[in-house]
Curated annotation (Swiss-Prot):
InterPro entries: Glutathione-S-Trfase_C-like, Glutathione-S-Trfase_C_sf, Glutathione_S-Trfase, Glutathione_S-Trfase_N, GST_C_Tau, Omega/Tau-like, Thioredoxin-like_sf. The gene is GSTU14. Residues 93-220 form the GST C-terminal domain. Belongs to the GST superfamily. Tau family. It is found in: Cytoplasm, Cytosol. Its EC number is 2.5.1.18. This is Glutathione S-transferase U14. GO terms for biological process: glutathione metabolic process; toxin catabolic process. May be involved in the conjugation of reduced glutathione to a wide number of exogenous and endogenous hydrophobic electrophiles and have a detoxification role against certain herbicides. It holds the Pfam family GST_N. It comes from Arabidopsis thaliana (Mouse-ear cress). It is an enzyme of class 2 (transferase). GO terms for cellular component: cytoplasm; cytosol. Gene3D superfamilies: 1.20.1050.10, Glutaredoxin.
Length: 243
């Protein structure tokens, strides 16, 4: 596959995972066309998305020539291998590379599982359990940052790397959870490294154009809640016995 083949990215501004390939594309200075996909709950999925990702039918999807690559972490790895010139995203050392992949999967499996459990909690017991689990996950991630950064600014050391990009998907959801709950999960006493990392990461030139602010994410969530309420109201009215 030639590097000069057309590159497109199907993403969604509401999807926290879509930021991962956008940061990677920016770091690699790859020219591409960005195709905004409507929110899953607000509109029909495009035919291009359904054709490109027929299994999960979700963003993001990278289209390189006539090839479609799905899943955000998989896309980032593909970009690093298909465009091997500097800067490298994955570590060059085999052990460090395997470790970065392990912790990236930990973020998607454990951290997001805890975050989703908290937002979907139906009672105080479930909320307390999910709060404890998310706190534990972030404490482990803090420890991982301290070890992998080696006293430098990013998980990847001096520069943004694979694990930084993986962790980027957490920033929006955690900010929203903190905004709508009484809990503070990223705080100086327990996650000082992650706090400073988030500030540096958001300010990076490869991140800033694609990472919404906390206020923007919160406003978007409020808008989605309002739109969901309106849709449910219209649906209930149209199916009532008075129709």
């Amino acid at each position: 596959m030639a590097q000069n083949d057309t590159v497109k990215l199907i993403g969604c501004s509401d999807d926290p995972f879509s930021i991962r390939p956008r940061v990677a594309l920016h770091l690699k200075s790859i020219k591409y066309e960005y195709l905004e996909e409507p929110d899953d709950d607000l509109g029909e999925k495009s035919q291009l998305l359904l054709k490109s990702n027929p299994i999960h039918k979700k963003t993001p999807v990278l289209i390189h020539g006539d090839l479609a690559i799905c899943e955000s972490l998989n896309i980032v790895q593909y970009l690093d291998e298909a465009w091997p010139s500097d800067p490298s995203i994955l570590p060059s050392n085999a052990y460090d590379r395997a470790s970065a992949r392990f912790w990236a999967q930990y973020i998607d499996d454990k951290c997001f599982e805890a975050a989703n459990a908290l937002t979907g909690a139906n009672n105080d017991e479930e909320r307390i359990a999910a709060t404890g689990k998310l706190t534990e996950c972030l404490a482990i991630l803090e420890e991982t940052f301290q070890k992998s950064s080696k006293g430098l600014g990013f998980f990847g050391g001096e520069t943004i790397g694979y694990l930084d990009i993986a962790c980027a998907a957490l920033l929006g959801p955690i900010s929203v959870i903190e905004m709508f709950s009484a809990d503070k999960f990223v705080r100086e006493e327990t996650t000082p490294g992650l706090i400073q990392w988030a500030v540096r990461f958001r300010a990076h030139e490869a991140v800033r154009p694609y990472m919404p602010t906390v206020e923007e994410v919160t406003e978007l969530v409020k808008q989605r809640i309002e739109e969901g309420f309106k849709r449910n109201f219209k649906s209930n009215v149209s199916t009532s016995e008075y129709e």
